[in-house]
Amino acid sequence: MILHTLRLRSFRAHAESEFDLAPSINLLYGANGAGKTNVLEAVHYLCLTKSFTASRDRYAVRKDAPYFEIEGRIGQVREEPMTVRLAYVPGEGKSIFVNGAELDRLADIVGTLPVVVFSPEDYDLTAGGPSERRRFVNNILSQARSVYMETLMKYRRARRQRNEVLRSYKKRSAPPPDELLAPWTEKLVGLGSRIVHRRQQFLQAFADDLEEAYRRIDAVAERPTIEYDTIADLAPDATPDAIEDEFRAALARKQGQERDRGTTLVGPQRDELVFRLDDLEVRRYGSQGQHRTFAMALKLAQYFYLQQRNDTEPLLLLDDAFGKLDAERTGVFLDLLRSDAVGQSLVTATRRGPFEPALNAEPASHRALQVRPGGGTAAVTPDPEYARGEATAANGAASAPTGADAASTSRD
């Protein structure tokens, strides 16, 4: 599936913007601060109901607006697309609609159109704290299997309840009675063990995708691997029952510390992933180039993994992903975007120069949109030169469209 059209209303810099998108490369280019990243963020909201930044929903509402709304038409290239609309009202929350009917849960849309994001913040994936790497795994597995996301949400609720019991009795300077703590402990063990087991299975399957992705990006013969540091020294093929037994035993060993600190100290919320190139631990000893290459390989491997396990090609969002790449790796990625291995992509850049060969080679499959700030919003128009070339390719001879004929418009 692809995203055919996108409409933003009162979202970030966009008062009201509409986009007609091509089935392959869609280049959004313009000056910094023009609103390019906002477009990718809106697509991420539509696919996963949240931003790929750390920003809260209320900050995405345009100044002085009462809400924001994002709408997209999603479907196969030659089939009637469905209309997906997400609305957010501060104080009321988010709602999502498919063909006008509101879904019971926001989570029900996740996985409909899988999405993979490349951004400058990917450096945090290899250099940041463990939570960045857990978030990466959760993102992949939630899009691949809805049952994983449901289990994760139930686990978080159970952990919050267990922590409330621990905190309340910490204030009383007394251990919580078993009849209060034990039910939440058992629920935590059951749900947490399923999460750990699924992560183990995922990392075993993901290893081949990571090697393939790294090989495509870098010709250096380094072997990327991921070590999984979880509840205890579990065997990679540990059964769910074995994981439950170890989880329960680990909680028993930490019982006193948990009472003193008023929080759960064991579980998948403390998992760590260790990235290595051969024997080199990337987070501690990797060069900036190795960090950047490993992070890009992880995201490309994510694309391959979701591509194999979903009924549709993932959508690639690349936010200034080429800004710090050398010419050779930029060329490698552009070739990949143009190939049959990758479906639709939305790419932001400050200039269109590096993309000219791809844009000119297949004008029916690619599109260039220039994003310019205008009147406090982001005015989006097809690039005149590109539009002229596209029209010529389609009709043999045609003049460039005027601003009134633009396929993508933005208005206050």
Curated annotation (Swiss-Prot):
Disulfide bonds: none annotated. One of its GO terms (cellular component) is cytoplasm. ATP binds at residues 30-37. One of its GO terms (biological process) is DNA replication. One of its GO terms (molecular function) is ATP hydrolysis activity. Residues 389-412 have a biased composition (Low complexity). The RecF protein is involved in DNA metabolism; it is required for DNA replication and normal SOS inducibility. RecF binds preferentially to single-stranded, linear DNA. It also seems to bind ATP. This is DNA replication and repair protein RecF.
